[in-house]
């Protein structure tokens, strides 16, 4: 059973956060330079942009994985049994993204010990929860999955507390709520598209792929319609950032 968690669910959770990990790594020298120049405004702007971009990616990934976790498990691993673990671990995508970005900012500020200490604390929480939750028959391996989410969440919250302490930085709540609304609309569309496609073609793989495509279109449309994305939010995306920013600006103007 733990193979479903460590070999399947965890691997899927780490895929979307590859982008946020790269984003966090790129933040370190940028923040360090701004700190050296005593440009607090640049630190805040870079931090906010990075967090908005990370959430733009991780929130829909979390919702998408959660609503069609079992079909994804069946498609990738030829078994639906990893579905519950994937559904629970999907929450960790968003939390891990926040942790990675805030860690990058703190390291860039020269506070390298803080994220390390926070990770030690969060890891201790994970061990404690895993020890207790997995022993419960009703939880089992899902207890370990929730403990992993708690690990990411505790580290993310502690990092945010220190960012507020040193820079008075807080996440843009309205922007985050808008992204969750857009992702919720997408999640409903994904679920409906999967069941609709499966009832017609009777193929889990094709129905899952169709649902993912529908979800992508719906999410992109939703974030533009409800103004959850601005050109500057996607400007920093490697290679395609300027084109994405121009497209968002044109679409926003038309709507």
PLM features per residue range, with description:
Residues 5-95, 105, 111:
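Specific pore-lining/lateral-gate transmembrane helices of multi-pass inner-membrane transport
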Residues 12, 56, 88-91, 117-125, ...:
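Hydrophobic residues within alpha-helical transmembrane segments
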Residues 46-66, 72-76, 142-166, 179-180:
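Short alpha-helical transmembrane segments in multi-pass integral membrane proteins
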Residues 62-67, 75, 88, 127, ...:
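Membrane-embedded alpha-helical segments of multi-pass transporters/permeases
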Residues 91-121, 131:
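Membrane-interface junctions at transmembrane-helix termini in multi-pass inner-membrane proteins
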Residues 99-110, 160-176, 198, 229-232:
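Alpha-helical transmembrane segments
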Residues 113, 123-157, 188, 192-213, ...:
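Membrane-interface helix-loop junctions in multi-pass transport and translocation proteins
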Residues 192-255:
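Membrane-proximal transmembrane or re-entrant/amphipathic helices at the cytosolic face
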């Amino acid at each position: 059973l733990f193979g479903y968690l460590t070999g399947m669910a965890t691997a899927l959770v780490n895929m979307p956060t590859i982008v946020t990990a790269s984003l966090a790594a790129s933040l370190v020298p940028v923040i360090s330079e701004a700190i050296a120049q005593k440009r607090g405004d640049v630190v805040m702007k870079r931090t906010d942009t990075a967090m908005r971009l990370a959430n733009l990616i991780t929130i829909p990934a979390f919702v998408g994985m959660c609503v069609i976790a079992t079909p994804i498990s069946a498609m990738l691993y030829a078994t639906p049994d990893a579905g519950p673990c994937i559904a629970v671990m999907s929450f960790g995508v968003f939390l891990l993204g926040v942790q990675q970005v805030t860690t990058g900012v703190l390291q860039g500020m020269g506070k390298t010990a803080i994220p390390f200490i926070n990770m030690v604390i969060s890891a201790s929480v994970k061990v404690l929860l895993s020890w207790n939750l997995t022993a419960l028959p009703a939880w089992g391996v899902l207890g370990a999955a929730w403990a992993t989410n708690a690990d990411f969440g505790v580290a993310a919250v502690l990092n945010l507390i220190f960012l507020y302490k040193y820079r008075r930085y807080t996440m843009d709540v309205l922007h985050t709520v808008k992204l969750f609304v857009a992702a919720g609309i997408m999640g409903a569309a994904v679920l409906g598209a999967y069941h609709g496609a499966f009832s017609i073609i009777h193929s889990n793989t094709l129905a899952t792929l169709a649902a993912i495509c529908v979800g992508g279109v719906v999410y992109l449309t939703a974030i533009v319609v409800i103004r959850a994305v601005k050109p500057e939010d996607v400007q920093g995306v490697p290679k395609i950032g300027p084109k994405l920013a121009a497209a968002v600006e044109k679409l926003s103007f038309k709507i």
